[in-house]
């Protein structure tokens, strides 16, 4: 049960972080992401072939994907832990949860005058699905290895 609570708390903290960022104004958000974009530029675009505003926008989109990837990992951990506790496999609940977070995230941005786009929901959801998929794959691989070791003894 400790794992269930730990993953639930991590997922809730990630949701608060995501929605907290969405509550920021355009200026606050740009001030926060500009230094990150500048520090990543020498690594991702060393010859500076991409225009600065385009690169900044790319980094902002990438940040959303990374945030939602992490959310997907935490939600998958919660679902796997809770499923083991309940002796059930939970698949649709985590998918609907991360989709709901993405939709609400864009809805919040509508009120902060940052604009809300369906493409951003799709991008966020894709990041979350990637996180869910990677985490589920790792959890099932871990269980498979664990079961093989138990049967080998």
Placement of each model-derived feature along the sequence:
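Internal alpha-helical transmembrane segments of multi-pass membrane proteins
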Residues: 83-96
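"…centered on the first transmembrane helix and the immediately adjacent amphipathic helix/loop
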Residues: 1-69
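Aromatic-anchored segments of alpha-helical transmembrane domains
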Residues: 15-23, 98-107
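Membrane-interfacial alpha-helical segments at the cytosolic side of multi-pass membrane proteins
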Residues: 68-82, 128-142
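Active-site alpha-helix of zinc metalloproteases
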Residues: 56, 60, 69, 97, ...
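Interfacial helix-loop-helix junctions of multi-pass membrane proteins
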Residues: 102-126
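Short, charged juxtamembrane terminal tails flanking transmembrane helices
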Residues: 147-153
């Amino acid at each position: 049960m400790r794992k269930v609570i730990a993953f639930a708390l991590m997922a809730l903290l990630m949701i608060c972080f995501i929605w907290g960022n969405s509550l920021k104004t355009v200026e606050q958000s740009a001030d926060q992401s500009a230094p990150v974009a500048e520090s990543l530029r020498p690594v991702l675009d060393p010859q500076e072939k991409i225009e600065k505003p385009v690169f900044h926008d790319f980094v902002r989109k990438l940040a959303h994907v990374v945030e939602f990837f992490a959310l997907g990992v935490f939600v998958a951990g919660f679902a796997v832990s809770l499923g083991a506790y309940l002796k059930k496999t939970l698949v649709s609940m985590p998918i609907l949860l991360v989709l709901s977070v993405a939709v609400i995230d864009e809805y919040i941005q509508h009120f902060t005058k940052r604009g809300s786009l369906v493409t951003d929901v799709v991008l966020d959801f894709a990041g979350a699905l990637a996180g869910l998929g990677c985490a589920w794959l790792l959890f099932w691989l871990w269980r498979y290895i664990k079961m093989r070791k138990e049967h080998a003894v």
